[in-house]
């Protein structure tokens, strides 16, 4: 009797287990879905017009793959071997800075549904307001033998447009771009070689001087090397108006009228060095060295310089570069009698305050050896960034600057690829952020590079942002409404 009862119980358990197994086993097997492990599906992808992003995956027991929330003009497609999905932004659009979420829906044969969100930030170069003072321009020389110049733009939100000029116009800037200036809603960009380099290689580009709309970057005028054939390797530009565009070359300074194409040499500017102009009070300033250093002042009234001799008390034999101060004076970096200086010169009463620094500040071909925010001076030697809190107290001597100088950081210690700085620093007047360009080296190494952004009041061991491998021999930093 006991054996019979046990047999019945065993049979019941077997039937119960069988029933459970039959209920759990799907008719078609489980949905298997694995996205490419190299993809960061949780981050927002920056995408520009006509650009595509591809997402690889492996799947089994799939009934269908569909997509939802696709914006108008965007396309989503599956590869022929059903191993990836591509998302393409529209070629034309009137918007920029919009975030979109496209949902990929995968349904299994067993009815299971899995959804994957793909996040995109649509950045449209043709719909950006480039005259925002918080934006950052990086003008690139390009490789003299093989490529044209370009204009990198970093939006106030920190998104990089690799060549904004080309993205807007469909054409390229001249070979070896050197400098740019802002005036009355326009940007003026000068290149060293234009459409032909010194060995006779021709390039397809927009020439030696390009004038563009400061808000849209659309080209308005351009001038080829043949139209400006008098110029010998131009390096710097300053603008008072369309009839007074000043260009420095190996001879000196010329005035160019973009409407009449008149190009006239400024008498007395012979030997003006590679140094960025200062534009202040409707006048243009540059420098000239000699036994006694001088400022060259140029006005729209006449094509001749007014030479301003620095005080005899100034211990300078060579001026590296000049800059505009917030209180209408002129900053300068200089050398004399074995010492290096930062000075502040008053045009009104011809007085100068000097403070000694410990190193020769780097400038490269940009002619920018320092930048300022108020009375705080920033400069570099090698890959080391320095600052000087400039105290104008007349009771202090020149040597007081050595005590006020401080080392902020060595970029090479933060990134071993930062082997050298390329051209001068930049500081955005609207944000106070400081910018530095570094490269791994010349030759094949220049493509390994970084744009560094530092909060001058923050931690100098960690940049606020760092943008890698965007530049092509950067000529310098530029900011809208900062001529």
What are these language model-derived features?
Residues 42, 68-84:
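Low-complexity "stalk/linker" and mucin-like segments enriched in Ser/Thr/Pro/Ala/Gly
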Residues 1-45, 110-136:
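Bacterial Sec-dependent N-terminal signal peptides
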Residues 159-172, 218-228, 261-268, 304-313, ...:
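A short beta-strand motif characteristic of beta-propeller blades
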Residues 172-181, 229-238, 270-282, 314-325, ...:
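Repeated scaffold domains used in trafficking and secretory/extracellular systems
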Residues 256-384, 392, 396:
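Acidic, serine/threonine- and glycine-rich low-complexity intrinsically disordered segments
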Residues 142-146, 193-203, 252-253, 291-293, ...:
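Short glycine/acidic-enriched loop and turn motifs that connect beta-strands
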Residues 446-483:
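Blade-level signature of beta-propeller repeat domains, shared across WD40, Kelch, NHL, RCC1
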Residues 24, 34-67:
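Solvent-exposed, low-complexity, repeat-rich "mucin-like" stalks and linkers
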């Amino acid at each position: 009797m006991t054996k019979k009862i046990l047999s019945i119980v065993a049979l019941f358990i077997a039937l119960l287990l069988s029933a459970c197994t039959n209920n759990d086993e799907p008719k078609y097997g489980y949905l298997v879905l694995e996205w490419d492990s190299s993809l960061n599906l949780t981050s927002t992808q920056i995408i520009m017009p006509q650009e595509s992003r591809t997402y690889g995956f492996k799947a089994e027991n799939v009934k269908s793959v569909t997509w939802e929330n696709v914006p108008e003009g965007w396309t989503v497609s599956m590869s022929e071997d059903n191993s990836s999905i591509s998302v393409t932004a529209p070629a034309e659009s009137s918007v920029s800075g919009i975030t979109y979420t496209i949902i990929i829906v995968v349904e299994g044969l067993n009815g299971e549904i899995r959804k994957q969100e793909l996040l995109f930030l649509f950045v449209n170069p043709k719909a950006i307001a480039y005259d925002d003072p918080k934006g950052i321009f990086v003008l690139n020389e390009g490789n003299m033998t093989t490529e044209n110049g370009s204009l990198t733009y970093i939006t106030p939100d920190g998104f990089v447009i690799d060549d904004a000029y080309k993205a807007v116009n469909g054409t390229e800037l001249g070979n070896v771009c050197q400098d740019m200036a802002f005036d009355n809603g326009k940007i003026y960009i000068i290149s060293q070689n234009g459409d032909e380099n010194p060995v006779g290689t021709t390039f397809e580009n927009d020439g030696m001087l390009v004038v563009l709309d400061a808000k849209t970057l659309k080209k308005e005028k351009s001038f080829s090397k043949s139209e400006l054939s008098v110029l010998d390797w131009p390096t710097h530009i300053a603008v008072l108006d369309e009839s007074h565009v000043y260009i420095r070359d190996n001879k000196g300074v010329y005035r160019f009228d973009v409407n009449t194409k008149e190009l006239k040499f400024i008498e007395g500017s012979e030997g003006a060095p590679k140094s960025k102009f200062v534009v202040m009070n409707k006048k243009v300033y540059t420098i000239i060295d000699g036994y006694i250093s001088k400022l060259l002042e140029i006005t729209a009234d006449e094509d001749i310089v007014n030479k301003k001799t620095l005080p005899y008390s100034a211990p300078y034999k060579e001026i590296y570069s000049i800059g505009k101060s917030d209180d209408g004076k002129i900053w300068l970096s200089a050398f004399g009698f074995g010492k290096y200086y930062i000075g502040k010169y008053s045009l009104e009463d011809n007085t100068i305050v000097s403070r000694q620094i410990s190193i020769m500040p780097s400038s490269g071909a940009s002619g920018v050896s320092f930048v300022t925010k108020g009375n705080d001076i920033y400069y570099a030697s090698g890959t080391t960034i320095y600052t000087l809190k400039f105290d104008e107290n007349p009771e202090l001597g020149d040597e007081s600057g050595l005590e006020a100088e401080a080392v902020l950081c060595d970029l090479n210690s933060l990134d071993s690829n930062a082997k050298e700085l390329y051209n001068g620093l930049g500081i955005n007047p609207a944000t106070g952020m400081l910018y530095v360009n570094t490269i791994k080296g010349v030759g094949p190494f220049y493509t390994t590079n970084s744009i560094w952004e530092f909060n001058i009041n923050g931690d100098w061991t960690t940049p606020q942002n760092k943008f890698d491998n965007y530049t092509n021999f950067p000529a310098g930093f530029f900011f809208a409404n900062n001529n």
